[in-house]
A protein has these predicted regions:
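Blade-terminus and WD-like Trp-Asp/Gly-His loop motifs, strongest in beta-propeller folds
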Residues: 43-50, 89-97, 133-141, 226-234, ...
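The serine-hydrolase catalytic nucleophile loop
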Residues: 449, 460-474, 489, 625-626
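A flexible loop/linker signature enriched in serine peptidases of the S9 family
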Residues: 55-68, 81-88, 99-111, 119, ...
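Active-site-proximal cap/loop segments of hydrolase catalytic domains
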Residues: 473, 478-480, 486-676
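Non-catalytic accessory segments flanking enzyme active sites
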Residues: 43, 143-145, 171-177, 181-211, ...
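Short beta-strand element of the alpha/beta-hydrolase
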Residues: 440, 448-458
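Short loop/turn segments that connect beta-strands within beta-propeller blades
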Residues: 73-77, 114-118, 199-203, 257-261, ...
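Beta-strand-rich domains and repeat architectures in extracellular enzymes and scaffolds
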Residues: 31-67, 190
C-alpha cells in the first residue's frame, strides 16, 4: 500500500520525463555489445596500492580483439592504460615492475615493464613462445610455460630446428600413435607444455618439468595450475601422468625445486587436483579436488595439505556446492573462496581449522577472481550480472558496501536499455524444483503479446544466471523483441551434486521434462504468445535441440549450434573420451542400449520443425560432422533448414565479424517463423 501511495504522489510531468529518458535509450543489440570493454585477470600489487588488469576490446575493421593492461589505485581513481598488445600482468614482489605476455613481436613472449608502463623490456625470445608468467618471491626469476619438444626442453636451437622442419617439410601428415591427440581447436603434435624459468634480466631458460607430459595438463588444465612457494624454493604444479590422458581426469600435484631437479608427487587422489596455492606462511598448500575418477563434473572441494606432516583435510566437505576461485587471508588463518549457487556466485570464507563457512558477499551477481590485500582489510574481485558485464570491485574483507574500481562500460550501458533478469521456479520431473530466468524486451508492455525464445545451456553441467556472456547474450535476443527464457534443468550446476548427477545416463529424460515444464510456464505468461516460441542451444544445448526435434512440435523454429546428433559416432570423434564413458556408462560397444536410447538420430522420422544448424570446422569437442548429419536428415525429409559452417571457428564463434554474422542469422531465422 505504501508503495502504491508513493507512486501516486509522483507528478505526472516527472513520470513523462522518466518515460522519455527510457525511450531515448537504444536497444542493446550486437553492435552495442561489440563496444564493451572485456575486463579480466585483476592482480593486486604486493604493497596493496594498485590493481593491474587486462582489458580486451573489439576492432571490427581488423576483425581482432586486442588486449591491453590497465592499472587503477585500490583506493579508487581513474583506470589508466599502461600497455598495448599485452596480457597476464604479474607484479614483482616489490611492486615496482610488472611482468606480462605480449605477441607484439609475432610470437607470445615474456616482457617486463615499470609499474607505470615505462621501459618495457623483452625477456624471452623463444621459438616456441612463452606464456603464463609468474615472478619468484625473491624477484630474481620468472617462471612461465612454453610448448617445447620434449627431447629439446629449454634448448631453443633444438626447438627452432624442429619447428623449421615442420614448417618447411613437403609432407604435412600427422602421425598419431595414442590418445589424446587434439583438444578444442588444437592438434597435440609432438610438443608438450613445460614449466621453464629464466632470470629477470634475461638469459638461458631452464626446463623444470622435462619429459613427455604437459604442465599444466593439455586438457582440464589452466594458468592457475602452478604456484611458487613463499620461500621461493619450490614450485607446485598439476600434471596428468596417466597412460591414456584421453580417458583420465586424474591430474595430481607435484613439487619441484625452483632450481630444477627430481619432482615429487604430493597427491594420490585418482581424480582431479588443481589450482594449488601456498599459504603466505608456507605451512599449507590449498587446492581444489574432485574425488570420482573420470567425472569432470564431480563436486570441487577445497583441500588443505599441511606440508610438514602430510595431513590432508577437505575444508568444504559439508558444502554441497562447487568451490571456484579462492585466496588466502594474509595471516594464513583462513581462505576466501567463491561458490556458485542458484544462478549466482558468492564469496565465503573458512578457517584452516574447518567449521562453518559464512558468506562475506552475495547478491544478484557472479563474483569471482578474489584477492585479499596484504593488510587483510580489503578484497578485490570481479563482479558481473545478466545485465552488466565484468567490472572490478573492492569491499571490506568481512563484507559490506561494494565500490566499483572500474567503470569502463558505463557510457555504453547508459546509452542502451538493458533489462534485469527475473527469477522463476517450476516443478520439473519428479516434482524437483527447477529454476529459470526471464529477460523481457526493452520498452516492455505488459498488455502486449511477445514471441518467446528458450535458450538451453551447454555442459550439460553448466548454468544460466547472473553472469554476462558475449556468445549467447540474452540482452541481444531480448532487444530483437523476444521474451527470453533460460531454464536450468537437471544437470545444471549450483543446485547440489545430485541435481548435477541426475543428467548422467539420462540426457533426454528428466532434463527434457524440466525444459518442457519451463516451456509450459512461459507459454502461459499473459504477455507471451505461446504459439510463437523458438528454442536454441549450443553443445549439450544443441543436443537438446536435436532431441526436441524428434519429441515435440511446441516450437516454431529451432537453432542447433554444435549439437550432438548421433551419440554413437560423436563418442569416438570427440577428444575428451572420459566424458562419454562417464555419461553413458562406457563406449557404444560397452553399453549400446544407452547410446541407442538417447541418440537424437534415431528419432529422425519425427523431425518437422524448421531448424538452423551452425557448426565450426575447427570444433574438436563436437566435430562438425554432427551438424552435417543433422542437416542432411532435415533436407532429405524436406524440413525447412539452413546450415552455416564457419571454417575458422571451433566450438564457439569468437571472431568479431563471425559473431555479428552469427547473431544476425540466428535472429533472422527465428524471426522468419515466429514473427509472421
Amino acid at each position: 500500500m505504501h508503495i502504491r501511495m508513493a507512486r501516486a504522489l509522483v507528478p505526472v510531468p516527472l513520470l513523462l520525463l522518466a518515460s522519455a529518458l527510457v525511450a531515448q535509450k537504444l536497444p542493446f543489440d550486437v553492435h552495442a555489445m561489440m563496444q564493451l570493454a572485456r575486463i579480466g585477470d585483476p592482480q593486486l600489487s604486493p604493497d596493496g596500492r594498485w590493481v593491474a588488469f587486462m582489458v580486451q576490446t573489439v576492432d571490427l575493421e581488423k576483425n581482432t580483439k586486442p588486449k591491453q593492461i590497465y592499472i587503477v589505485p585500490l583506493a579508487g581513481g581513474e583506470p589508466r592504460k599502461i600497455a598495448d598488445e599485452a596480457d597476464r600482468p604479474r607484479w614483482s614482489p616489490d611492486s615496482t615492475k610488472i611482468a606480462f605476455v605480449s605477441d607484439r613481436g609475432g610470437t607470445p613472449q615474456i616482457w617486463i615493464m615499470d609499474a607505470d608502463g615505462a621501459n618495457p623490456k623483452q625477456i624471452t625470445n623463444l621459438s616456441t613462445g612463452a606464456g603464463g608468467v609468474l615472478y619468484s618471491h625473491d624477484g630474481k626469476n620468472l617462471v612461465f610455460t612454453s610448448e617445447v619438444f620434449p627431447e629439446c626442453g629449454a634448448d631453443d636451437n633444438c626447438n627452432r630446428q624442429k619447428l623449421d622442419v615442420e614448417k618447411n617439410g613437403k609432407v604435412k601428415a600427422r602421425v598419431i600413435t595414442g590418445l589424446l591427440y587434439r583438444h578444442w581447436t588444437t592438434w597435440q603434435g609432438a610438443r608438450r607444455s613445460h614449466l621453464l624459468t629464466v632470470p629477470v634480466g634475461g638469459g638461458a631458460a631452464k626446463d623444470l618439468t622435462p619429459g613427455n607430459r604437459d604442465v599444466p595438463p593439455f586438457s582440464l588444465g589452466g594458468p592457475d595450475d602452478y604456484a611458487i612457494s613463499p620461500d621461493g624454493t619450490e614450485i607446485c604444479y598439476a600434471m596428468n601422468s596417466d597412460e591414456v590422458p584421453a580417458v583420465s581426469t586424474n591430474s595430481d600435484l607435484y613439487v619441484v625445486p625452483i632450481g630444477g631437479g627430481p619432482a615429487k608427487k604430493v597427491t594420490i587422489n585418482p581424480a582431479a587436483d588443481n589450482s594449488p596455492q601456498y599459504s603466505p606462511d608456507g605451512k599449507y598448500l590449498a587446492y581444489r579436488a574432485q574425488i570420482r575418477a573420470g567425472h569432470e563434473s564431480d563436486r570441487w572441494r577445497l583441500m588443505l595439505l599441511e606440508r610438514a606432516t602430510g595431513k590432508l583435510t577437505s575444508l568444504t566437505e559439508s558444502l554441497d556446492r562447487w568451490v571456484e576461485s579462492f585466496a588466502w587471508w594474509p595471516d594464513s588463518s583462513r581462505i576466501f573462496f567463491t561458490v556458485q549457487d542458484r544462478g549466482r556466485q558468492y564469496i565465503q570464507f573458512i578457517s584452516v581449522n574447518g567449521g562453518a563457512a559464512p558468506i562475506a558477499l552475495s547478491g544478484n551477481s557472479v563474483l569471482d577472481d578474489i584477492q585479499v590485500a596484504p593488510d587483510g582489510k580489503m578484497m578485490i574481485y570481479t563482479r558481473q550480472s545478466g545485465s552488466s558485464p565484468v567490472e572490478i570491485f573492492r569491499a571490506a574483507s568481512g563484507g559490506g558496501a561494494e565500490t566499483a574500481l572500474t567503470h569502463l562500460n558505463d557510457a555504453v550501458l547508459n546509452a542502451h536499455q538493458l533489462t534485469a533478469l527475473e527469477e522463476f521456479w517450476v516443478d520439473g520431473a519428479e516434482n524437483a524444483r527447477v529454476q529459470g530466468f526471464l529477460v523481457k524486451p526493452p520498452g516492455f508492455q505488459p498488455d502486449k503479446k511477445y514471441p518467446a525464445l528458450m535458450l538451453i545451456h551447454g555442459g550439460p553441467e553448466g548454468f544460466w544466471g547472473e553472469d554476462w556472456t558475449y556468445r549467447w547474450n540474452a540482452q541481444v535476443f531480448a532487444a530483437a523483441g523476444y521474451v527470453v527464457a533460460m531454464p536450468n534443468p537437471r544437470g545444471s550446476t549450483g543446485y547440489g551434486q545430485k541435481f548435477i548427477d541426475d543428467i548422467n545416463g539420462d540426457w533426454g529424460g528428466r532434463a527434457y521434462d524440466d525444459i518442457m515444464a519451463v516451456t509450459d510456464y512461459v507459454a502461459k505468461l499473459p504477455y507471451v504468445d505461446g504459439d510463437r516460441m523458438a528454442a536454441a542451444g549450443g553443445s549439450y544445448g544443441g543436443y537438446m535441440i536435436d532431441w526436441i526435434l524428434g519429441h515435440t512440435r511446441r516450437f516454431k523454429a529451432l537453432v542447433s549450434h554444435a549439437g550432438v546428433y548421433d551419440l554413437r559416432t560423436e563418442s569416438t570423434e570427440t577428444e575428451e573420451l572420459w566424458f562419454p564413458i562417464w555419461e553413458f556408462g562406457g563406449m557404444p560397444w560397452d553399453n549400446p542400449e544407452m547410446y541407442q536410447r538417447w541418440s537424437p538420430s534415431l528419432f529422425v522420422k519425427e523431425f518437422r520443425t524448421p531448424t538452423l544448424v551452425i557448426d565450426g570446422e575447427l570444433d574438436f569437442r563436437v566435430p562438425y560432422g554432427q551438424g552435417l548429419q543433422l542437416f542432411t536428415a532435415l533436407q532429405l525429409q524436406k524440413v525447412p533448414s539452413r546450415l552455416i559452417v564457419f571454417p575458422d571457428e571451433g566450438h564457439w564463434v569468437l571472431k568479431p565479424q563471425n559473431s555479428l554474422f552469427w547473431y544476425k542469422n540466428f535472429i533472422d531465422w527465428i524471426g522468419n517463423w515466429t514473427k509472421k
